[in-house]
Structures are given as C-alpha cells and as structure tokens.
C-alpha cells in the first residue's frame, strides 16, 4: 500500500467532514502526474541522445571524423 502524503490530516478530528482530505488527494494526484512527466522526460532525453549519436555517426560518414571533430571544437561542443 502506498503511504499517503500528509497522513496527519487523517488524525485531525472531523477532518472527514471538511474538504481537506479531498484537497490532499488532489495534491497527491499532482505529485503522481509530476512523476509520470518526469519519467516521460527521461525517456525523451534518452531518445534525443540516441538520435544525436546517430546523426553524429551519419555526419562522420558524410564528412571525415576529423572534419566533424574540428567543427565541434569550433562550435565549443
């Protein structure tokens, strides 16, 4: 079972009769959404890295490795 955030709200007398628990659940949902977006961002960064490596490899097939490396050095890469 996942531990609830701000579980202390459950310990307050009468908390169930307020909107505090629902608001807490909304915060938890936001945190879950943020975690999913972080996972997606990591996946996208990985894809971008792989595509960058592929592009560099193809550039080295079109120009010499030395030309590519000099261009990277000039660009401060």
Curated annotation (Swiss-Prot):
Keywords: Plasmid. InterPro entries: KleA/KleC-like (IPR035338). To E.coli KleC (kcrB1). This is Protein KleA. It comes from Escherichia coli.
